[in-house]
Amino acid sequence: MSLEQEEETQPGRLLGRRDAVPAFIEPNVRFWITERQSFIRRFLQWTELLDPTNVFISVESIENSRQLLCTNEDVSSPASADQRIQEAWKRSLATVHPDSSNLIPKLFRPAAFLPFMAPTVFLSMTPLKGIKSVILPQVFLCAYMAAFNSINGNRSYTCKPLERSLLMAGAVASSTFLGVIPQFVQMKYGLTGPWIKRLLPVIFLVQASGMNVYMSRSLESIKGIAVMDKEGNVLGHSRIAGTKAVRETLASRIVLFGTSALIPEVFTYFFKRTQYFRKNPGSLWILKLSCTVLAMGLMVPFSFSIFPQIGQIQYCSLEEKIQSPTEETEIFYHRGV
């Protein structure tokens, strides 16, 4: 079963889905538009949404939370003093896609990103011997990234399953190729410069992550994504907004993987010069893994918070066919994760 089919066959075709009530506005979209959070508030919000327990929330609990958010007119923000409302918003934002109102597959929810990515990034940055040991971590890393980017991206446009599958395959192949280049260069030429050996994998990991986002979400800039007014009403589909959404996500991934890969390399460089390392050389891998997990643990919510989930764009920047039916000066679009 493909990832797209898995997403569609989730048991949670949730209350208030867009095809059920024409005037319905997705609660998650309403939240991100009305909150207009600062970077600090977005960061704190993401630290809650990235709680690993959000991966295991039951469908029944999510449906009950959605029912509360969809039927209670007084529910407007998780800042409410009511603990039930706070928990309902957390469950909804962490598990439901804003464009389709479908449940996000458990393995590709934002809360699952760090547990999967941290050890995989560590393995992909570790010098290994043998072609299989070099390629397999990169394939897994790039395949998971492509699936995560696609599932959590904007899904407001129509797309054939074959079209999306081909793009996913291209994203995995191209980013994997970029990711393995440093390892093959090292195996063939035996680079000796300490900083070249450390920085080359970081540079190519950044390139691979950027390529992955661009390829897996390129349909957003080709077909266009839905743009909305401040009430959440869809005004049309814009390629310009789609391109902006992809660029913002690409920039956030570069920050995430570049920083998360660079920090462990810097720490290990200085650690290898200490007396403790000379006595305990095996501790290097423990330190590097710990640094990778800690760096990604900080950088995942940081990178997800750089840009708002619901971005803004001036109406005069959009296509003429969208400008004409509205007098709004600020238009909104779902950027995706």
From Swiss-Prot:
Disulfide bonds: none annotated. One of its GO terms (cellular component) is nucleoplasm. It comes from the Eukaryota. It is found in: Mitochondrion inner membrane. Pfam families: SFXNs. One of its GO terms (molecular function) is monoatomic ion transmembrane transporter activity. Mitochondrial amino-acid transporter. Does not act as a serine transporter: not able to mediate transport of serine into mitochondria. This is Sideroflexin-4. The gene is SFXN4.
